[in-house]
């Protein structure tokens, strides 16, 4: 894990400084190793709004005392904040408050409040300082908080004892949960902003137990404004379309029946027709391989078999995916489904004619015909199906 690697580096540096002399140790102690940042809106302005930037710093002395592990009577980090309309100004203000210099090369996570990112260009402007710094890593993970972003960096994170580390670890779970999207890296987001492509970022929510990743924030390509979000359930449909989710569970609940289908493999094939360049047709075929994780039914007289169960799974999954499509295509009108890229590869000549009005201007994306066909296969059912069901 990147964060664990960072903690080891800081601890080794601190111990090395102690062994080699006071001057090097003092230099390390004077640095505030920033591992996470959070940005919230404070005051509306015509141009850039006033933001509150919160920076989580690791304390090398605490790490060396604890042997690099979480625990102890005190936290091994501090959060420092400042209010300004730019990151540089916030850093300047913080420099007057504390004795440490903020050191950013090892930052792992940046969290924005959804309210802040509802303003055009704020994401791009705020990330600019991170992108321009040649010492900054390109794999910083980006998140959106559905409420206060600072609160995410304050939540209890034991046994990790570093909220930023805990958030970084959460991002490892998406392959097992289709209600979460894959972690977004700053380098990937920069590429999409440069090419004016719409994109998504994972949403963080505070719960009684701590923090969870659930759902997706939708960003418009032309001005990287957050135009809305998808719930965890709605995110499932999007994940299957873009073909980046190969795991997770899909549950169907009917009157007297519950089916939980565990997906192990997903293959996607998209057929495109650009006969009408401004109203293309996309036929999306999803071939799934999985097993029955759970099956409940009370009508024992009703004879079910694998084909019938596969049909039920197919119909319900198509229904939910079409619901997700309707939201992003008709309500938010942003191509986070990446169908523009499919169009581009299929017919580059026609794509050049419509690209500037794909999901902006005339917004041809919102009028495209998108149909989904789900082909599930139940593997190794064995004793999972009662005799009457097989």
Curated annotation (Swiss-Prot):
Keywords: Germination, Lipoprotein, Membrane, Palmitate, Signal. A lipid is attached at residue 22 (S-diacylglycerol cysteine). GO terms for cellular component: membrane. Residues 1-21 form the signal peptide. It is a lipid-anchor. NCBIfam families: spore_ger_x_C. Belongs to the GerABKC lipoprotein family. This is Spore germination protein GerLC. It comes from Bacillus cereus. The lineage of its organism: Bacteria, Bacillati, Bacillota, Bacilli, Bacillales. The gene is gerLC.
């Amino acid at each position: 894990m990147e964060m664990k690697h960072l903690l080891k580096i800081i601890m080794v540096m601190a111990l090395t400084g102690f062994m080699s002399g006071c001057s090097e140790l003092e230099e390390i102690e004077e640095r505030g190793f920033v591992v996470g940042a959070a940005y919230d809106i404070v005051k509306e302005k015509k141009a850039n709004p006033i933001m509150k930037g919160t920076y989580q710093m690791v304390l090398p002395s605490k790490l060396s005392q604890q042997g690099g592990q979480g625990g102890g009577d005190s936290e091994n980090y501090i959060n420092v904040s400042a209010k300004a309309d730019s990151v540089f100004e916030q850093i300047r203000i913080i420099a007057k408050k504390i004795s440490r210099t903020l050191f950013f090369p090892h930052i792992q996570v940046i969290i924005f409040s959804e309210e802040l990112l509802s303003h055009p260009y704020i994401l791009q402007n705020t990330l600019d300082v991170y992108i321009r710094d040649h010492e900054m890593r390109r794999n910083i993970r980006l998140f959106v908080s559905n409420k206060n972003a600072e609160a995410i960096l304050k939540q209890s994170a034991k046994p990790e004892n570093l909220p930023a580390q805990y958030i970084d670890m959460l991002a490892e779970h998406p392959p097992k949960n289709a209600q979460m999207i894959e972690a977004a890296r700053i380098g990937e987001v920069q590429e999409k902003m440069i090419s004016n492509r719409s994109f998504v970022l994972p949403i963080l929510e505070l719960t009684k137990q701590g923090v969870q990743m659930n759902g997706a924030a939708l960003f418009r390509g032309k001005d990287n404004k957050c135009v809305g979000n998808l719930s965890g359930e709605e995110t499932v449909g999007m994940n299957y379309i873009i073909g980046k989710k190969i795991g997770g569970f899909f549950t169907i609940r009917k009157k007297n029946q519950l089916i939980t289908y565990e997906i192990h493999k997903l293959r996607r094939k998209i057929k495109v027709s650009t006969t009408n360049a401004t109203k293309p047709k996309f036929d999306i075929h999803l071939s799934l391989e999985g097993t029955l994780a759970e099956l409940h039914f009370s009508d024992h007289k009703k004879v079910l078999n694998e084909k019938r169960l596969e049909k039920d799974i197919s119909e319900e999954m198509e229904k939910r995916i079409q619901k997700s499509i309707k939201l992003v295509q008709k309500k938010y009108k942003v191509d986070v489904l990446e169908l523009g890229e499919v169009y581009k590869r299929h017919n580059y000549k026609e794509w050049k004619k419509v690209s500037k009005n794909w999901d902006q201007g005339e917004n041809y994306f919102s009028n495209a015909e998108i149909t989904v066909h789900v082909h599930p296969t139940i593997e190794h059912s064995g004793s999972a199906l009662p005799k009457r069901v097989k």
